[in-house]
């Protein structure tokens, strides 16, 4: 359905590049599967309607089709059968069917809250740059794409290379990517941890972490180590490469290196041209892609 809608003339600019149905099918699959691969840039092929459809496809992929169907069922006051609950439990990576409905609504609340907050931060840069309407829309598009780790943007054909040294865009998008890649189970654990710490105020910080799941511990510790190690390695490998970050100051070099480390594991955005990166750096990026997210 998504590919058919994107292939219709009403979804295209009047002067958009000539495309076939297979091009739109490829883009649709890439959006729903949140891979970030595209045979035609979103900004050149699709108008406002096409880009809204693209956002919906990415959001569907990020949340998962099973959870969307279940959410719709619960919203319509209907009940899920046992087989449907088993499917939803598996889709949400839950060990139990207890409180599936409440857990699902938490997932949606977390998703839309993080996307909205990050979009507001991005708007502080995009509204002065693109104007009110386009600034808000472009911010929402980028926020949805980044949180869902989809890797698409509607800003041009160079990904985020024009914003390589822009701290607002880099940090906001990196935060969204990390938030989406951690997984909802980790986020729910983090929220419960913060509530427990605020409410009980344990004298020893370690006491607040005791109910934290082993999965959350593993994901957070490994993510921190990979980000720190990956950033330093990418910086050391590229710091003298004038085609990538060699002409930037140290803080800008670290910012670019950090962003590549974040996006390589799951998202697919880019603030440098990887064809200009050193072979050893691209090898590092390949290893990060193999490792992936939480």
Which residue ranges define each predicted feature?
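Membrane-proximal intracellular helices of multi-pass ion channels
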Residues: 1-294
């Amino acid at each position: 359905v998504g590919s058919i809608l994107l292939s219709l003339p009403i979804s295209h600019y009047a002067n958009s590049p000539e495309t076939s149905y297979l091009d739109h099918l490829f883009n649709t699959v890439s959006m729903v599967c949140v891979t970030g691969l595209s045979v035609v840039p979103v900004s050149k092929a699709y108008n406002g309607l096409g880009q809204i459809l693209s956002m919906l496809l990415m959001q569907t992929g990020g949340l998962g089709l099973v959870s969307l169907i279940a959410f719709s069922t619960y919203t319509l006051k209907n009940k899920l059968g046992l087989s449907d609950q088993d499917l939803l439990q598996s889709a949400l990576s839950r060990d139990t069917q207890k409180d599936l409905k409440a857990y699902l609504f938490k997932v949606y609340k977390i998703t839309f809250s993080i996307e909205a907050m990050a979009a507001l931060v991005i708007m502080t840069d995009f509204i002065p740059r693109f104007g009110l309407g386009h600034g808000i829309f472009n911010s929402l598009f980028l926020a949805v794409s980044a949180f869902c780790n989809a890797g698409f943007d509607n800003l041009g054909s160079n990904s985020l290379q024009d914003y390589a040294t822009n701290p607002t865009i880099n940090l906001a998008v990196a935060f969204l990517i990390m938030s989406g890649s951690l997984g909802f189970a980790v986020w729910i654990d983090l929220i419960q941890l913060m509530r427990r710490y605020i409410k009980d105020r344990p004298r020893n910080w370690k006491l607040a972490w005791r109910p934290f799941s082993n999965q959350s511990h593993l994901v957070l510790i490994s993510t921190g180590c990979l980000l720190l190690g990956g950033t330093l390695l990418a910086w050391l490998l590229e710091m003298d490469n004038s085609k990538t970050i060699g002409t930037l100051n140290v803080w800008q070099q670290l910012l670019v290196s950090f962003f590549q480390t974040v996006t390589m594991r799951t998202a697919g955005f880019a603030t440098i041209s990887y064809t200009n990166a050193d072979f050893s750096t691209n090898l590092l990026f390949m290893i990060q892609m193999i490792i992936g997210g939480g």
